[in-house]
Amino acid sequence: MSSYFVNSLFSKYKSGDSLRPNYYECGFAQDLASSRPTVVYGPGSGATFQHAPQIQDFYHHSASTLPSNPYQQSPCAVTCHGEPGNFYGYDALQRQTLFGAQDADLVQYSDCKLGGAQGLGGEDAEGTEQSPSPTQLFPWMRPQAAGRRRGRQTYSRYQTLELEKEFLFNPYLTRKRRIEVSHALALTERQVKIWFQNRRMKWKKENNKDKFPSSKSEQEAVERERRERELRESSGSGGAAGGGGGGGGGEGGSGGGSVAATTAGSQPPVNVDCCEKTHKQM
């Protein structure tokens, strides 16, 4: 399809001079075009430059080294004589100055790049020189001293009260409930966990148990036994005090009997004949 359009253009425009506008046909432009290399465009190939005869004589050795392009003899090739910028309506001098400015900028940028590369190289060298130095140690990275101990956590009255109520309800907390309690009391999960562990140990010491009850019913049974034991101990101490009081009362009774015996022994004996005489007279 591309060959069709190229052939149609080739048949309509026989030479490249007809494609150039008339206002470019001046002596200066012709001289410039004659001094400039000729550019040949072909399908599937890049731009091929054909230099002027004086330039070819000056660079005679380059003509022998450049291979000939087989696409130049193709009938589909479009040959444009002169500067390719003239074909598109651009001035060759402006393009030349533009390229010159770009070359100067590139030279300046290359110096900057070289300086930047040297600076980077210097920084890399400094980094390699500083790398053998020991890394910075933060306080949390250093091991704790032997004489130092972690501070004891203090709980407020409100926190202690809430933790005690939670312990009475359930001595063992699940992970979800522990998170809820820690958020409610402004504590960490670790602090709540440690508090419950210490509270269970305290309960075992108070109840003389080697193992904390796993269920609430077992805990209630243990509490009941403890209360009964306390009641027995209190009743035993009260009975011993009452027995001592009863013993004192017995001593008092025996003392009273001896007093009565002594009083009875001190009175004279009663005469039976006198009693009978008085009864007959009545």
Curated annotation (Swiss-Prot):
GO terms for molecular function: DNA-binding transcription factor activity, RNA polymerase II-specific; RNA polymerase II transcription regulatory region sequence-specific DNA binding. Pfam families: Homeodomain. It is found in: Nucleus. It comes from the Eukaryota. PANTHER family: HOMEOBOX DOMAIN-CONTAINING PROTEIN, HOMEOBOX PROTEIN HOX-B8. Keywords: Developmental protein, DNA-binding, Homeobox, Nucleus, Transcription, Transcription regulation. Signal peptide: none annotated. Residues 148-207 bind DNA. This is Homeobox protein Hox-B8a. One of its GO terms (cellular component) is nucleus. A motif (Antp-type hexapeptide) lies at residues 137-142. Residues 118-138, 206-282 are annotated as: Disordered. PROSITE patterns: ANTENNAPEDIA (PS00032), HOMEOBOX_1 (PS00027), HOMEOBOX_2 (PS50071). The gene is hoxb8a. It comes from Takifugu rubripes (Japanese pufferfish). Residues 236-258 have a biased composition (Gly residues). Belongs to the Antp homeobox family.
